[in-house]
């Protein structure tokens, strides 16, 4: 039970890591009319779940969870470098590092000490932070992956609710609809070969590029 409570804390919107300040290109996509209602937002997020979460973030989270457990920091560093390199725009790379840096400050205050080997990993990407926290708090891997996806989905949907805008009830309905795909995505991630880890979300990359010079912005990405 305690591990579940620690997991809820790790994905809480109140966690002071600034997750709510990023839209990952969604803000520009909405301004240009690519995303304009509940249905188009669902399609936008589903494509990211299948083209990035299932084939990049979750597979690397799985790798890091194992590697940190066996203290293979050299290989863990490889995957941390890989995920940052896979962020195809400047603002997405900055976001990855900013989230990681926020966790690097937070985790020691939550009782997870960072060594000279683990600090550079967490400071680079929040994926390493999730993996390390799960290893220290003995959170099962499948629960960790589900929680990571929930955290991403909730932030993305709430950004859409604010920007389109949608009603709060519509946002909650969308979360129910999209979480139905989570088990499928995790199963796909568990089987995904290491030599195929990567993402293919060209629309998001274009939107993120354009967002970097968008005149009026609420979000940092």
From Swiss-Prot:
Location in the cell: Cytoplasm
Main localization, broad class: cytoplasm
Gene Ontology cellular-component terms listed: cytoplasm
Molecular function in Gene Ontology: nickel cation binding
UniProt cross-references to InterPro entries, sorted A to Z: UreF, UreF_sf
Keywords: Chaperone, Cytoplasm, Nickel insertion
Subunit and interaction comment: UreD, UreF and UreG form a complex that acts as a GTP-hydrolysis-dependent molecular chaperone, activating the urease apoprotein by helping to assemble the nickel containing metallocenter of UreC. The UreE protein probably delivers the nickel.
Purpose of the protein: Required for maturation of urease via the functional incorporation of the urease nickel metallocenter.
Protein name, entry field: Urease accessory protein UreF
Gene label: ureF
């Amino acid at each position: 039970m305690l591990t579940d409570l620690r997991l809820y804390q790790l994905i809480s919107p109140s966690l002071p890591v600034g997750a709510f300040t990023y839209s990952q290109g969604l803000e520009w996509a909405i301004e240009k009319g690519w995303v304009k209602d509940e249905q188009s937002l669902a399609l936008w997020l589903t494509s990211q779940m299948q083209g990035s979460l299932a084939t990049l973030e979750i597979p690397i989270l799985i790798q890091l969870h194992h590697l940190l457990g066996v203290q293979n920091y050299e290989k863990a560093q490889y995957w941390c470098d890989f995920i940052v390199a896979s962020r195809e725009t400047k603002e997405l790379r900055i976001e990855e590092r900013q989230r990681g840096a926020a966790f690097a400050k937070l985790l020691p205050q939550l009782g997870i000490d960072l060594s000279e080997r683990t600090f550079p990993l967490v400071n680079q990407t929040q994926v390493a932070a999730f993996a390390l926290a799960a290893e220290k708090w003995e959170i099962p891997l499948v629960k960790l992956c589900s929680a990571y996806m929930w955290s991403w989905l909730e932030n993305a949907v709430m950004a859409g609710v604010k920007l389109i805008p949608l009603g709060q009830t519509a946002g909650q309905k969308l979360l129910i609809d999209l979480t139905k795909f989570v088990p499928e995505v995790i199963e796909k991630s568990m089987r995904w070969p290491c030599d195929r880890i990567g993402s293919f979300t060209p629309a998001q990359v274009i939107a993120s590029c354009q967002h970097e010079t968008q005149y009026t912005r609420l979000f940092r990405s």
